[in-house]
């Protein structure tokens, strides 16, 4: 039996937890998720314990949990060749999930407005710690954030 998102393609430009968790839920619901990772480095979450061993290979348990049911490619979106490949992927996608530092993809010419011209039907999910809805930017909207930062600032 097909799952609810079977046939939906998601391009996931993500790292650590917020983006991977979001796209994990989409993958669990049947979407084809293609995770973009930096060549030679990958998602930094790959190096965070605890590690589990399988067939003599140690892997980060958290990374494996949040990135299940996904495909993954190493792609340098900072050079022209990598940008072109990324744009081609987006042209054939339904959704982009992105949780990089606010403004970083815009500087590369790969932000929402850039990608929307390539694929007018694209759904673009940008995850940030302090929000970044155009026209409603708060004083911290350009700052990167992790869960612990939000907890500290809210007094939890």
How does the language model describe each region?
Residues 1-156:
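N-terminal helix-loop segment corresponding to the beta1-alpha1 unit
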